[in-house]
Amino acid sequence: MRFDREDLSQFVGKSFIYNYDKGWRYELYVKNRITIDYRVHSGIVAGRWVKDQTVCLARVGENLYRVSWTEPTGTDVSLTLNLHDFVVHGAIYFPRWIVNNPEKIACYQNEHLEEMEALRDAGPIYPTEIIDSFATLIYMRDCGPDNEQVISCPPSELPENYPFCLPDKNLLPESAATE
């Protein structure tokens, strides 16, 4: 094996912004080895943002990482980030209740955990909707671990030219960082 599976040092503390082929924009901050924050800028659940989501992180190649989790909503997510080719592959398993009413989760989830769990329990769960899609990384920055300021507001409060207005250096090559 040409890489150390346990070494997540080049991944933890990074913030990623990516556009799915469907046109949806997501932002992911790998806060530490077991926690992420994220926000959804556009797509069926635009406006959603979450802090301190427990995850499983795995390094599966030299510049290849997997992030997987189950949300209080009943949604399961698995992301593979390829930092060599600047792509993300996402598999999102939405319960039927979210597909039917996505606006119900377009909020700051941390303030609505009991409501999310009640909606999940009320269902319906099936048939599950699988969203299997590629995304292109447009911005990557090193924010360090456990930085509470990386994702600290809803996407609606960000400047129109976000993330390109950030003072942090975009770590992607210029050819990869297109809007």
Q: Model-found features: residue ranges?
A:
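Alpha-helical transmembrane segments of secretory-pathway, organelle, and plasma-membrane proteins
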Residues: N19, G23-I34, I105
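N-terminal glycine/threonine-rich, aromatic-flanked beta-hairpin/loop signature
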Residues: E27-A58
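A short, structured loop/turn motif at beta-sheet edges
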Residues: A58-N63, H84
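Tryptophan-anchored aromatic micro-motifs
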Residues: M1-R25
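Surface loops and adjacent helix of pleckstrin homology
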Residues: D21, R39-H41, T70, Y93
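Short, surface-exposed coil-to-beta transition loops
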Residues: D21-Y26, R48-Q53, T73-L79, V87-H89
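Short, hydrophobic/aromatic-rich segments at coil-to-beta transitions
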Residues: Q10-I17, R33-D37, G61-S68
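Beta-sheet ligand-binding and adhesion/scaffold domains
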Residues: S68-E179
